[in-house]
Amino acid sequence: MNSLKAFTLIELLVVVAIIGILAAVGVVFFSGFTESAKVSATKQIESQTIKYTKAEIMKCKLGAVTAMSGYLNCTASNPGLFAFNVMQALTNVSSLRVGNIDYGVLKDSKNPYDNSLPAIRSRADYEVGQVSISVIDTNLQIKTCYRSGCAAADTSLVLISTTD
């Protein structure tokens, strides 16, 4: 007589249940890692934007005629207009426009929470994953929201003077 060896239905169900539990736990941990990565990416984009902006403004102060890959005219005599031109070069260059979305010189930076949008935009409000730039007098106001909900602890506000 041949004896066949096989798993019983109960043993198979136990294995499937264990795999399901492990998968559920893994998804929870994985989503935490992705949120953390989005926060880090947003902070990195903000930091790079601020450094780049300050460096390009300094080029103008040192006598350059243009900056920001030629999209910023350094010769604007009105300080408020110069600040506006800096914001426009960062966020709204007509030749870089795609569909209804405005892009600036840092067009390769995408919003970590919505890759269909640029990370750097001309806005006055906090929007998750976005570096929002607006002009106040001769200053650039840079608002960044790192997490969904944009609670005070998850936002940043930086002013960059275009005249100092």
Residue ranges and their predicted role:
Residues 1, 34, 39, 47-50, ...:
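General helical secondary-structure elements
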Residues 2-34:
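N-terminal single-pass transmembrane signal-anchor helix
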Residues 3-6, 49, 131:
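Intrinsic disorder/low-complexity segments enriched in polar/small residues
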Residues 7, 11, 24, 42, ...:
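Low-complexity, intrinsically disordered short peptide segments enriched in small/polar/basic residues
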Residues 14, 21-25, 44, 74, ...:
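Alpha-helical protein-protein interaction elements
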Residues 35-65:
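Membrane-proximal N-terminal amphipathic helix
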Residues 58-164:
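Periplasmic/extracellular, small/polar-rich flexible segments of pilin-like filament-forming proteins
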